[in-house]
Amino acid sequence: MTPAATATATATTAADASDLTATDPLGDPSSHRVLTGDRPTGPLHLGHYFGTLRNRVRLQDQGVEMFVLVADYQVITDRDIADRLAEHTENLVLDYLAAGLDPERATIFAHSAVPALNQLLLPFLSLVSVAELSRNPTVKDEIAHSSQAAVNGLMFTYPVHQAADILFCKADLVPVGQDQLPHLEVARTVARRFNERYPHADGRAVFPRPRALLSDAPMLPGTDGGKMSKSRGNAVALGADEDTTARIIRGAKTDADRRITYDPSARPEVSGLVLLAALCQERDPEAVAEEIGDGGAAALKRTVIESVNEHFRPLRARRAELATDRGHLRQVLRDGAERANAIADATLAEVREVMGAI
Ligand code: TRP
């Protein structure tokens, strides 16, 4: 699929009426439990940061209970081997901590370290039809971009596994990007069907109905105008140094029109760069484009490079410092797994009870 087709495929899944955006009022922060996560396939990039990472930190700082998942089993959906898994996992934790997630307040864990979470996959899979699994637009998109010769079974079932990620801790809010909305729909379907089929004796439902918490930032495209992705080589990593940042942005695609404007549908490449500078400067993209005016692509890129490097300097300094203590990163994961296991064990016991397994 071309990048343009990708955008269409993901955009066709509309937000559920109950989904929230980052600017919607949350009410009492302590009434929510938030879970979100990332695949440990490489460093997080600026799209992750503006799309979800900074919202997670905002939620944490508001006092919402946070679970942040390193989705290590999800890595083997579209590749045969989870390459350098431990290293990527630690680096993901590093990105989290550098961005401001605080392991004292947020539970950071890898789902392979939580057996009871994974066991929920079995009853959950029985609640979803094969036809539903094969219709998932995000899965279809990933299959189109996969380098594997054959599509494996996990590729079709991982959205149900993701439902287990969300439901094991009974999260009600899931901060995600637009492309994850089909998976949220799966989680809601699983929760609803499970509750209908297996209510508690007193009628109580086991699982809440999880809602997406969508970023208020417009989707940040990669340096080629397509979806920003570590695997597509069009992303600036959060922890990239200033020279690397400059090199990647200098190599970004632009167009022949010297006048810089913000027009995402007609000029995706130029608009992506304008948007990136605007997000870093906390200004409207129109104002940033206006200021560059007839300066052309060279002036635009200079502005973007400066804005990114300036905005991320403190985060990158913190990241470099944290990177010197790998033992601490592993300890964060151990502590997180301990908390997540206690919750997953309790949920699995409840699931087995309502199913009549004990
Ligand atoms: N699928 C998500 C991604 O690729 C990662 C993920 C796994 C996730 N489990 C999750 C996100 C649960 C939110 C909730 O980015």
Regions found by a protein language model. Name each.
Residues 44-51, 59, 65-71, 81-88, ...:
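Structured ligand/cofactor/substrate-binding pocket environments in proteins
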Residues 64, 130-134, 168-175, 278-288, ...:
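Short helix-capping/linker segments at secondary-structure and domain boundaries
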Residues 40, 174-175, 234:
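A generic structural motif
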Residues 6-10, 188-358:
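Conserved nucleotide- and phosphate/pyrophosphate-binding catalytic cores
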Residues 2-164, 320:
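N-terminal Rossmann-like or analogous alpha/beta NTP/dinucleotide-binding catalytic cores
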Residues 93, 100, 128-132, 171, ...:
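A generic secondary-structure signal for well-formed alpha-helical elements
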Residues 29-33, 49, 66-72, 97-99, ...:
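Short amphipathic alpha-helical segments, especially helix-boundary/capping motifs
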Residues 31-35, 73, 133-135, 181-184, ...:
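Generic detector of short, locally flexible boundary/turn motifs and exposed helical patches
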